[in-house]
Amino acid sequence: MNDEIMRFSSDWFYGGKVESAPQIKYRSVLDYDHPITWIDTSDKEPADTIEEGEDLNFKEQFVGESFGRINKAEAELTLLTLAEYFTKIGKQRVLSESIDVGIISPYRAQVQYLKKLIKKYEFFKPYRRLIS
């Protein structure tokens, strides 16, 4: 795993004890690539969906009996960003090199919502096996 990504999860979840393997420490897909991206959505306008439709605000919603948290606009923004990234790399390269990506969310309900959207959007069909 790229060191910048590993450092985040190592520091946040494991007290800085996890380290990247030296041979992949600086691995990236694109020369101008950023392995991890933070986007402040606190002042964002409502988001459009990948498929034209409703505007979504960046507010968390509680869902289900366990009151899991989801943020639909953040999920849409995440997938729009991923779609742009795949487009920039190129479909042929992503598929031929099996370039896999991971989306990290602290909420189980958000993870389930993201999986649902990935299945819903036709754009992601060829890439589904590469997204975790």
Q: Regions from the language model: what does each represent?
A:
Residues 16-119:
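Conserved helicase/translocase motor-coupling segment
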Residues 115-129:
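Extended hydrophobic/aromatic segments used for targeting, binding, or gating
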